[in-house]
Every structure is written in C-alpha cells, then in structure tokens.
Design a protein with these regions (language model features):
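Divalent cation-coordinating acidic motifs and surrounding scaffolds
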Residues: 81-90
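Charged interaction patches that mediate protein-protein contacts
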Residues: 29, 89-92
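Amphipathic beta-strand/beta-sheet edge segments enriched in Tyr/Trp
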Residues: 53-63
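Short, charged/polar, Gly/Pro-enriched secondary-structure boundary elements
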Residues: 41-44
Length: 92
C-alpha cells in the first residue's frame, strides 16, 4: 500500500529543494513514509501509515513549537492519496 503512495509521489516529480521523503521501517517492513515540506520559517510533515491513517503537523523553526497537529483515518487508499495532494498544494 505504501509503495503505491511512493509511486504517486515519484510521478509528481516534486521539487526536492523544498520536499523530502523519509521511509520508516520496523523489522525490515516499511510502516510509514513522511513527506517533509520546508519553508524559511516553518516545516510541514505528513506521515502516512500502512493502516490508511496520516498525521500532519506544522512546526515553527524559531520556537520549535507545533502550530498544527492533525490525525486522520481514511476508508480507501484513493481518499488518502487525495489528502496527500492537498498537503502538497498547501506547500506550494
């Protein structure tokens, strides 16, 4: 399931000067991926888990405080990927 998300990200040809992707493993199994979006004053992170849930957070660089933290669960992979696209739009 996470490989489909990664394939979608690769198809977008993101600007990797602003975005980075981190794959997280447990016992050699990929359990989540994190899309990180960097701005001069804040960073956004969207972590997608293999159970069709995601956590989105925005962190202020100066204070290192989380400005927004949101967890959401999805019933389909398509809805999760649509939410991923919304996060990417927020970052542009």
């Amino acid at each position: 399931m996470l490989q489909i998300v990664i394939d979608n990200l690769e198809a977008l040809k993101l600007d990797y000067s602003r975005f980075s992707v981190q794959k997280n493993y447990f016992n050699s199994e990929m359990i989540s991926i994190t899309l990180i979006c960097s701005f001069p004053n804040k960073v956004g992170e969207l972590t997608i888990w293999n159970d069709l849930s995601r956590v989105k957070e925005w962190i202020d660089y100066e204070t290192e405080k989380i400005n927004c933290l949101e967890r959401k669960e999805f019933d389909t992979l398509e809805n999760l990927i649509n939410d991923l696209y919304l996060f990417i739009e927020e970052c542009c």
